[in-house]
Amino acid sequence: MNPFQQNESKETLFSPVSTEETPPRLSSPAKKTPPKICGSNYPLSIAFIVVNEFCERFSYYGMKAVLTLYFLYFLHWNEDTSTSVYHAFSSLCYFTPILGAAIADSWLGKFKTIIYLSLVNVLGHVIKSLSAFPILGGKVVHTVLSLVGLCLIALGTGGIKPCVAAFGGDQFEEKHAEERTRYFSGFYLAINAGSLISTFITPMLRGDVQCFGEDCYALAFGVPGLLMVIALVVFAMGSKMYKKPPPEGNIVAQVVKCIWFAISNRFKNRSEDIPKRQHWLDWAAEKYPKQLIMDVKTLTRVLFLYIPLPMFWALLDQQGSRWTLQATKMNGNLGFFVLQPDQMQVLNPLLVLIFIPLFDLVIYRLISKCGINFTSLRKMAVGMVLACLAFAAAATVEIKINEMAPPQPGSQEILLQVLNLADDEVKLTVLGNNNNSLLADSIKSFQKTPHYSKIHLNTKSQDFYFHLKYHNLSIYTEHSVEERNWYSLIIREDGKSISSIMVKDMENETTYGMTAIRFINTLQENVNISLGTDISLNVGENYGVSAYRTVQRGEYPAVHCKTEDKDFSLNLGLLDFGASYLFVITNSTKQGLQAWKMEDIPANKVSIAWQLPQYALVTAGEVMFSVTGLEFSYSQAPSSMKSVLQAAWLLTVAIGNIIVLVVAQFSGLVQWAEFVLFSCLLLVVCLIFSIMGYYYIPIKSEDIQGPEDKQIPHMQGNMINLETKKTKL
């Protein structure tokens, strides 16, 4: 810093003195002063911009919070497909900002770009909400509408991403740089507030509200769409107050053209007779100005450090996909509150708001007092290590979940349980195949085997013969089964004898946190069971078996049941996370129906609170990596290259999501092993980044100031030339 300069927020401390007379200037008409907020230096127009950003971020993060479970529950995609499409959408949201910036800088300007692409965003939310209406066609229609809606949302939300914050900065005069800095802090707060509130509310709209007999995804997508409409209306209301700078040209395009020309010109002049140049970018000197070439040289040094960064984002962005899927296999009952699986994502914005001041005001200062030179690159490397530890913690939790989960049938295997609905005990033997020892004990009346038994098959499908011994009777029955399935053999009275029914249970896949229930009706009349306004089950007479239905976790003390001439209520009790229940309707009295409740698959046992350490670690890593990375990048590049750096930073996020997409589709690993893989990959990348950072020589701020950053007034007489800096955000 110049010794005469004490405050960088001021343009200059001394005015140049000239001995020559200055000719009088013609008076120009005074510019109309824009309205301020409560007499401050803040333009009133920024209030509309901040509210717009809050609503837009609410719509984006709210929709995204329930997106993975929408793929699972509504479209019935598997985990890998759901993860891949989720990250493909996220990646597209970070590619489209380059398009939005190009449109704003080269054609429409920021204001019109925000308006037009917000309309595209609104249309995308409307289509996305329509894709969640079961009455609108079948699965193909829902899938097409969903993908079209997501593409429009990605174009809209990504396209305005580089425009809104910068447009707010345009509203300030240069002399109000301090207020502009505080505006950006408020803008960032609006982003996190929108994310925090939406990731808490939209899962409640999904799970606590029922429509069309299931979770109300139409409402969970519709409310964010409504917030996007509000965002557009609020932004348009401030139109007359805004400063609307005209398009200034796309610096990103200029940089790309400069690099391309330098490379092509170098290859055209490969002859040994042509003198070599000091730097490969110097081959652009025939077409581009020297200052631009110097700025691009400085830029490429920073972009080289960006090469390892996508791997960090590959881990960070799995909070909404793989970690949400993990939460569906855990128990969300915290005692004082029941947390939905997709609500765990609220921890990230909440912890960001806590960790940023904690790190800035406490941790970094303590490290500095210990005499440790904790540079920006070191902070970023530590952030990577914390993300590695977060995924190691996630792998540990996943292993514990697998230990508590019921066994899965493999190739040429089935899992079998036996339910005895007869009035006395039954001895059952599986004939042949050395399976007769699996069911050695007698099964008492209205009891079941304590767990599923694994039965081995000779082929993929097979007929099994069972010997049932009841009183003095011996009954032989035959049933067909197929590999990799769960079965219940139901023994029932048949006059003075018994018979059996083989029923396929829930398939060998998780219910993703939902509760699965079904009914067996032993009465001689049909029973209709209503589980909600739109959920109804018809159970046939004489040991009819209903289909499975999935419902939200909760207490069901009075489920409405109806026979041909009577109405009853049935107490199902607590239906817990991830469990599968069988209710056997055994009797009908004046007081109501009586049912035997049996838990086929136990509820999730691992508490969702065990995800807290991994969220805390990855969020701490995000604060150290993301915030510090942007700060470092901006300090190492000329002001003319800030927008290029922003585009490159967003590209690293997009590439990180593509990495997750590829791994999810082609790794073929079990989930805990995939978490370990990501952790190890980032650790290797962290080592590479640390080596790159070790040899990186930071550039001093005065070495990268362009002409627009300097004021060197011409002085006459014995006055001293003073160099003055402008504050850059």
From Swiss-Prot:
GO MF terms, alphabetically ordered: dipeptide transmembrane transporter activity; peptide:proton symporter activity; tripeptide transmembrane transporter activity
Pfam families to which the protein is assigned, alphabetical: PTR2 (PF00854)
Gene: SLC15A2
Major location category of this protein: membrane
Keywords: Cell membrane, Cytoplasmic vesicle, Glycoprotein, Immunity, Innate immunity, Membrane, Peptide transport, Phosphoprotein, Protein transport, Symport, Transmembrane, Transmembrane helix, Transport
Residue ranges annotated as Cytoplasmic topological domain: 1-57, 109-113, 161-183, 239-295, 365-380, 633-643, 696-729
Function, in words: Proton-coupled amino-acid transporter that transports oligopeptides of 2 to 4 amino acids with a preference for dipeptides. Transports neutral and anionic dipeptides with a proton to peptide stoichiometry of 2:1 or 3:1. In kidney, involved in the absorption of circulating di- and tripeptides from the glomerular filtrate. Can also transport beta-lactam antibiotics, such as the aminocephalosporin cefadroxil, and other antiviral and anticancer drugs. Transports the dipeptide-like aminopeptidase inhibitor bestatin. Also able to transport carnosine.
pH relationship of activity: Optimum pH is 6.0 or lower.
Source species of the chain: Oryctolagus cuniculus (Rabbit)
Protein name per the record: Solute carrier family 15 member 2
Region Disordered, annotated ranges: 1-34
